[in-house]
């Protein structure tokens, strides 16, 4: 049987296009824009146009349960992301998984900007002007745990500072401070990608962080 996927915040349907082309998946989606929905529909079984903040997901998708629900770059845009977590619990199959991605508010470039008294919203990136919620590794796992979810796996996307929107800010730090920050856990993690299940005791210890990246810090600091 085909894998059933619900893509929340599907946008123009890039994920659906990939899954429909390369995998045996039946995909439903939801997006805020009718224009985006029109682009997505060729690859999705159903695409609903609605606001995640106010819609009743359980009612919109009441006849289905899913093997995977995807919230890719979604939770940070919501005032009450816990509402979506509650709805997803009802829509997952008994063995289903929630796939999420969120930006890392502990990225060293963002922290460097804060240290210089700035918190500058941008058109895109970690401080996208539409972001309402911010997460670090610990706070993400705590947030999920408090709302009845556990992390089964957690991966990261890293971005070197010269490739980020914060390079200029980091360049103004004293060298000793820059070296210290680059050595902290998740310093260069730009985004977290997680797999979660309802009620699962977090397999990735919420207090666990990767070891200090001394070698990486030394190498990277030599760029500045």
Which ranges hold each PLM region?
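Conserved beta-strand/loop positions that form the S-adenosyl-L-methionine
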Residues: 8
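Conserved alpha-helix/loop element of class I SAM-dependent methyltransferases that forms part
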Residues: 1-2
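Class I SAM-dependent methyltransferase SAM/SAH-binding core
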Residues: 14, 18-56
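A short acidic, Gly/Pro-enriched loop at the edge of an enzyme's catalytic core
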Residues: 58-68
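S-adenosyl-L-methionine-dependent methyltransferase catalytic module, highlighting the catalytic core
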Residues: 14, 35, 39, 52-55, ...
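Conserved glycine-rich SAM-binding loop
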Residues: 11
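A short beta-strand submotif of the Rossmann-like class I SAM-dependent methyltransferase core
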Residues: 68-74
């Amino acid at each position: 049987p085909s894998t059933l996927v619900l893509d929340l915040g599907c946008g123009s349907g890039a994920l659906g296009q990939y899954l429909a082309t390369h995998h045996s998946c039946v995909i439903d989606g939801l997006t805020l824009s009718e224009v985006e929905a029109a682009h997505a529909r060729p690859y999705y079984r159903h695409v609903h146009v609605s606001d995640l903040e106010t819609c009743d997901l359980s009612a919109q998708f009441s006849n289905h349960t899913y093997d995977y629900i995807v919230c890719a770059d979604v939770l940070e845009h919501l005032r009450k992301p816990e509402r979506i977590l509650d709805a997803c619990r009802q829509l997952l199959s008994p063995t289903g998984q929630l796939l999420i991605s969120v930006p890392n508010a502990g990225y060293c470039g963002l922290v460097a900007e804060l240290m210089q008294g700035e918190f500058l919203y941008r058109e895109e990136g970690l401080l996208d002007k539409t972001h309402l919620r911010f997460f670090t590794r610990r706070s993400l796992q705590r947030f999920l745990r408090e709302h009845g979810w556990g992390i089964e796996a957690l991966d990261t996307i890293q971005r070197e500072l010269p490739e980020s929107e914060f390079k200029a800010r980091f360049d103004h730090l004293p060298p000793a401070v820059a070296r210290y920050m680059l050595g902290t856990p998740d310093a260069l993690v730009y985004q977290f990608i997680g797999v979660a299940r309802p009620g699962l005791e977090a397999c990735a210890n919420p207090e666990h962080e990767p070891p200090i990246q001394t070698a990486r810090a030394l190498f990277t600091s030599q760029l500045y």
